[in-house]
Amino acid sequence: SSKLKPNCNYSKNKLHTEKILLKNLKNRILILRISNLIGINKFRNNNKKIHKTFIDSFFLNVQRGIIFNNEKNYKDFLSINKFGEIIEKLINKKVVGIYNVSLGQKVYLTKLVNWLNLFNKNKYKSIDIPKSYKTECFYLNNDKLMKKINIKNRLIDLEKACKAISKFFFKKKNK
């Protein structure tokens, strides 16, 4: 395992909390470090959100006719359905420890945007990301989790989920 070096207070606090929990609960705790989840939230209440997700920002911008040029940027994403499958396996196997829950590979935002925009019939313009936007690229190593629960986690599953989201969102908007 690699040495963790959090670079912001939020990350430092999460790591500090993990250490306290591990110290107090030893081998009776499951800590999940979850990547960006992608799914349809049919029960969305935007008034209660702490921050916007990538999907929130994407659909807000696409409604304005804007898509950001994200050619070089990548992150790690996981469909909400795959996340549910992973959680179910973890519960059934009574797993304890610390695990990264993710696809475990780079997902270029351009590719993700193309999937999410598949059913969009409206015109839009592609613009460069403003310099002021924070564009941190990362992906999580999920080898430990995949070995533990023996599950297949594939990019094609994320692609299918994104296309289903696109169909759901744009079919509703195009009516």
For every predicted segment, state its role.
Residues 1-6:
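Short alpha-helical oligomerization interface
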Residues 8, 49, 53, 75-81, ...:
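Residue-level signal for the nucleotide or nucleotide-sugar donor/cofactor binding architecture
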Residues 9, 13:
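Active-site helix of classical SDR
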Residues 20-74, 80:
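NAD(P)-dependent short-chain dehydrogenase/reductase
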Residues 39-41, 68-77, 99-107, 131-135, ...:
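Glycine-rich Rossmann NAD(P)(H)-binding loop
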Residues 81-89, 159, 163:
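Amphipathic alpha-helical segments that line or abut small-molecule/effector binding pockets
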Residues 86-132, 141-142:
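Mid/C-terminal beta-alpha module of Rossmann-like enzyme folds, strongest
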Residues 156-175:
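Amphipathic terminal alpha-helices
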